[in-house]
């Protein structure tokens, strides 16, 4: 992959890390190239791997109460940390966080861009326009999107072209959403096993 990132939204904080040189999803197992912390995160840590203890209400093992999104990137533009998901931005309502699979282009008045990644056009719809209602007039291409709204609530959407699969782990009230069905099965199995479920 050409980058990996994740974001966690809990009742107390929103936390994010981004990496290059993705290795495997088991224990995340990545080499950190840089760290991006959202302003309300609890503290900054630079180290190899992921340490959920830094988040206070998220234990190092077991289930945490919150939403988690992750994205493994296959670059359609420059491979660099700024183009690695999740993308974050702020407007009058608060902070938006999104990950996107697909390829989109922008049609309309120019909006501010910080990267060369097409996903930023989708984020701008939430920040500067009318969210997904703006896609029809301003976005061409295909997209599957997962993110957090300013209230920290998870949202998932896709158009009629982008693949998106979902599994639900009843005992954890946990949804797993992936654009690849095999990834969805593997991640679901990993979460079930890690939490001692069958």
Which residue ranges define each predicted feature?
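Conserved short alpha-helical segments that host acidic/polar catalytic motifs at enzyme active sites
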Residues: 1-198
């Amino acid at each position: 992959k050409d980058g990996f990132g994740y974001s966690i939204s809990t009742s107390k904080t929103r936390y994010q890390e981004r990496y290059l040189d993705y290795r495997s999803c088991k224990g995340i197992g990545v080499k950190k190239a840089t760290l991006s912390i959202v302003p309300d995160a609890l503290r900054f840590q630079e180290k190899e791997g992921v340490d959920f203890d830094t988040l206070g209400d998220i234990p190092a093992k077991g289930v945490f109460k919150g939403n988690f999104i992750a994205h493994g990137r296959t670059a359609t533009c420059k491979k660099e940390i700024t183009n690695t998901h999740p993308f974050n931005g702020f407007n009058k309502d608060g902070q938006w966080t999104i990950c996107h699979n697909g390829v989109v282009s922008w049609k309309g008045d120019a909006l501010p861009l910080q990267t060369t990644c097409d996903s930023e056009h989708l984020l701008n719809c939430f920040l500067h326009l009318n969210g997904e209602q703006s896609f029809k007039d301003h976005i061409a291409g295909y997209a599957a999107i997962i993110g957090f709204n300013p209230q920290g609530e998870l949202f998932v959407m896709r158009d009629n072209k982008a693949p998106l699969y979902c599994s639900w782990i009843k005992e954890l009230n946990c949804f797993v959403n992936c654009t690849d069905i095999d990834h969805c099965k593997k991640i679901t199995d990993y979460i079930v096993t890690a939490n001692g479920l069958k």
